[in-house]
Every structure is written in C-alpha cells, then in structure tokens.
Amino acid sequence: MFGMDEAKFERIDHREDVKKLIAKIDTTMGEIELELFHDKAPNAVWNFVNLAEGRQENVKNGPFYDGIIFHRVINGFMIQAGCPHGMGTGGPGYEFDNENDPELSHDTEGVLAMANRGPDTNGSQFYITLAPTPHLDGGYTVFGKVVNGMDVVKSMGTVDVDPYNHKPDTDIMINKVTIIRE
C-alpha cells in the first residue's frame, strides 16, 4: 500500500528527459514566456506541463489551462491563475507536496510558483510575482521565471480589480499554453 507521499507523487503522470523547458502563455493581454526549473522542482514542472498539454488526469478534458482566467491580481505583489472555476477555489482534483529548493527564492519580479492553501496542497494554481516577495520563501514551490513578457505581467498587475477578491473587472484569459522542449 502506498503512503500519502507516494500516492501524491504518482499523480504526476508523464516526465521526459530534457535539457530545457519553456512555457509560452498566450493571454488576452499578450504573451508571457517562462523558463521552467524541471531539475529543481520536477513535480511542479511536470504537473504544469502535463496539465498544459492535456496529458495529466484532471477535472477538465483536454489542455487544462486553455480558457482559464487570471482570477486574482494584486498590484505590486502578484498575478494568479489556474482555477478551473475562475474564483481561486478549485484545482485539478488532486494535490501534491511542496518542493523547496534553497537555491530558488522569491527574490525578484517574474518568479513563477505554485499557489496553495497550506503545506503540500499544490494542484493547478500558480502565480507570477510583480516584485520580490521573500516572505513567501519556504511556503510555496518556485518552479520557473519569466524570460520574456514581463511587460505583459506588469500590465496585468495594473488592471482594475474588485477590491474584495482582487478579481479583474475584465477577464484576462489564457488562450493557450505551449511547451517548448530543448
């Protein structure tokens, strides 16, 4: 019988041997290009890749992120997406453990990390920082960084939002996530 860690680990269905992974997120506000740290946070990266490509078992059919909105935007802090309900309350139907590599931190803008509701509750939600946020180190898995399109991320960070839940007044949609292997 599998312990909790093995059961969670098994949920990441597909992995590959690659030198470099790039994710291009095409949004209604422009494109964001991210380098994924598959060697430092393999569970988070392959979960993201498999969801993006529709290979990971989840609550949606097909590519998970296509058509999902950035449901939370806090100017000067971060933008967040990955909830299939568009409210920050949902995920793919499973969770996996945090990966905290001491070499990865929230030390700059453009950090890509898993959003969660507590330790070891990662699923599909992710955020991109708009500024250094070192207070998040150790609690959230950093798994990539913006390499192109930080201007798009910053523009997203300035949209009008509901003051209560920080949901943008006008939806910012993910049209498609494309994964490039090198």
Where are these regions (language model features)?
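Cyclophilin-like peptidyl-prolyl cis-trans isomerases
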Residues: 1-182
